[in-house]
């Protein structure tokens, strides 16, 4: 590849830069604790990770004290509401370890919703839309632009349509 994911992995300090510097709010990220830095970041990898528990507990993983309204808003932005509402238990639906009982696209939308529920300053989407169909991808990007306009969004994507209006 061209180093897109490597560059993205430098921001939350999964690796430290060997030359130069990366600044967040004008501060070299090496001068900020990893915990403090990662509190500012909502990171969604290409393969969304889910944990055993409920949909609700998965969405609260980054912000345990999120309100019901915040959780529902995050799901709506991530285009997850429609499939959540079809489940008999809705947000209390059990998720198997690794999310084996939901589709790839549903897993990605839940991982995206979890990052949104955290309400960080910076969102990093590392090819996080790849399992979404084109319509869902477009609707999700529009919602991100409308609802998260005060945040920094970094999007790595294979599809040119994903980043055209990012």
Model-derived segments and spans:
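ABC-type nucleotide-binding domain
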Residues: 1-166
